[in-house]
């Protein structure tokens, strides 16, 4: 039985949860396009989906704002159909073992600034800035950061007169305590400054892997919020941003000194990180940590498969197989990371726990040498496998292209860049993959993209009239099962 909303959108597996509802994978039965469907019970104590859908419609057209396809009531549920997106930044953060490089954080920050500035420019504040509410796109929008979950958003000024809402106190905490601003904890009405302060906490979290107020013990939610507030009040900006470039400290100090109704200087804040990117000689090429790690792993495994196919490597040998234990998974990730650092040393610059000061760009760039030294312990066969895998990909790509009357361009060979810059190892294969994704998107080929936390739930439809295909299911998910590990022998030498 097909369970549908809006007559043409079929409900699939559960893929996540928002502030006031669950989100499911869906399919447009007419076009085959994949979508996301958010359901909220009409018996909810504080229904928000109708309000959220109106905010989406009002913000539609902005870069990184999902497009709403349909909203309405189906049976005992309010349903909203929007664009299907990729993994959240929290999912990707966990994939990268809870640490992003400075380059990835800067590239994300510049996009997140733009999303928040657009929302503020349309007279709304988000009020729940956190990694879970920023998702990467799919296909040709795979490098674009999207913002979701406007159930807690609020209009902070009049649409016509732009008159700001009045200052108030004794407000309850709205949002996520970990990333909430100090003024939000103090019960002060939120405004634009609070979204930006929350974003600062998110960026520091990405760099350091945690925030000082995580892991505090408490018996009640109120006690936990109070302890988080106390910790935030006692941690200075200098301490919070120790070990990070000075620009992070300047950003947090600026946000904390904003007045309630003051318009932030978004250009100044963006310029802080743009200038830092220039000082560190980064390129905004949208090649994030997870992109490089997945690409590196794929190239090594590609060479493993070729060696097994040629008979040069036994798939069941100790060199080609690996245990599925947790320790071995961690070791595998570390080897992949070292491989990526060896090939792309200027990309992986990280926060160092021992740093108690704000490192200069020159000190950060010195990590390039450390990255090379750290990767020197890798077996030569791993480095050769990565090189061979990349070379095989370049050789096979022209053969995979669709034949046409015009000759296909040949892939460029790796060349050492002038002035001792890094070789152009990766753009060509990744850009060609993006071009193929773009062509598939234009041909309306459904793309199977799921979030890292997706598991198929069990759907009980016994309480529904099977003759009414448009009635949504009574969602009763069984406890989620962890994803099954790959069998031994799926990673070369890892």
Curated annotation (Swiss-Prot):
GO terms for cellular component: cellular bud neck; cellular bud tip; chromosome, centromeric region; cytoplasm; cytosol; Golgi apparatus; monopolin complex; nucleolus. The keyword Nucleus applies. Its EC number is 2.7.11.1. It is an enzyme of class 2 (transferase). Interacts with HRI1. Interacts with ELP1/IKI3; the interaction leads to ELP1/IKI3 phosphorylation. Transmembrane segments: none annotated. This is Casein kinase I homolog HRR25. It catalyses: L-seryl-[protein] + ATP = O-phospho-L-seryl-[protein] + ADP + H(+); L-threonyl-[protein] + ATP = O-phospho-L-threonyl-[protein] + ADP + H(+). It comes from Saccharomyces cerevisiae (strain ATCC 204508 / S288c). Pfam families: Pkinase. GO terms for biological process: DNA repair; endocytosis; meiotic chromosome segregation; pexophagy; positive regulation of clathrin-dependent endocytosis; regulation of autophagosome assembly; regulation of DNA repair; regulation of ER to Golgi vesicle-mediated transport.
């Amino acid at each position: 039985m097909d369970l549908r909303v809006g007559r043409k959108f079929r409900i699939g597996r559960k893929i996540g949860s928002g502030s006031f509802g669950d989100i499911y994978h869906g399919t447009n039965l007419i076009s085959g396009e994949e979508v996301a469907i958010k359901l909220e019970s009409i018996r909810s104590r504080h229904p928000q989906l109708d309000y959220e859908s109106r905010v989406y419609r009002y913000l539609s057209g902005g870069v990184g704002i999902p497009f709403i396809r349909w909203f309405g009531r189906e049976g005992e549920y309010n349903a909203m159909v929007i664009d299907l997106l990729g993994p959240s930044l929290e999912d990707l953060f966990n994939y990268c073992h809870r640490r992003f490089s400075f380059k990835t954080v800067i590239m994300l920050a510049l996009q997140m600034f733009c999303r928040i500035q657009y929302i503020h420019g349309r007279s709304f504040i988000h009020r729940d800035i956190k990694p879970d509410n920023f998702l990467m796109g799919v296909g040709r929008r795979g490098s674009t950061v999207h913002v979701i979950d406007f159930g807690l958003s609020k209009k902070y000024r009049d649409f016509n007169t732009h008159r700001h809402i009045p200052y108030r106190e004794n407000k309850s905490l709205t949002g996520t305590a970990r990333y909430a601003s100090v003024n939000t904890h103090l019960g002060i009405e939120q405004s634009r400054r609070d979204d930006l302060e929350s974003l600062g906490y998110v960026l520091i979290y990405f760099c350091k892997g945690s925030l000082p107020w995580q892991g505090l013990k408490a018996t009640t939610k109120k006690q936990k919020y109070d302890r988080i507030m106390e910790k935030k009040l006692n941690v200075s900006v200098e301490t919070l941003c120790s070990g990070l470039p000075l620009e992070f400290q300047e950003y947090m100090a600026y946000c904390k000194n904003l007045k309630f109704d003051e318009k932030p200087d978004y250009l100044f804040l963006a310029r802080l990180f743009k200038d830092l990117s220039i000082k560190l000689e980064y390129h905004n090429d949208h090649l994030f940590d997870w992109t490089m790690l997945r690409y590196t792993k794929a190239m090594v495994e590609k060479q493993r498969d070729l060696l097994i196919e040629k008979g040069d490597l036994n798939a069941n040998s100790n060199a080609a197989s690996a245990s599925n234990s947790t320790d071995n998974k961690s070791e595998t990730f570390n080897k992949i990371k070292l491989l990526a650092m060896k090939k792309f040393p200027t990309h992986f610059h990280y926060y160092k726990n021992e740093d108690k000061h704000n490192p200069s760009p020159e000190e950060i760039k010195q990590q390039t040498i450390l990255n090379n030294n750290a990767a020197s312990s890798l077996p030569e066969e791993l480095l050769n496998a990565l090189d061979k895998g990349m070379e095989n990909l370049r050789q096979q790509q022209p053969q995979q292209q669709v034949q046409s009357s015009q000759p296909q361009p040949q892939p460029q060979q790796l060349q050492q860049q002038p002035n001792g810059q890094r070789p152009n190892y990766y753009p060509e294969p990744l850009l060609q993959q993006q071009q193929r994704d773009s062509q598939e998107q234009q041909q309306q080929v459904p793309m199977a993209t799921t979030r890292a936390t997706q598991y198929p739930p069990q759907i009980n439809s016994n309480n529904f009239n099977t003759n009414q295909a448009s009635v949504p299911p009574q969602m009763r998910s069984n406890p989620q099962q962890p994803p099954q590990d790959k069998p031994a022998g799926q990673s070369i030498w890892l």
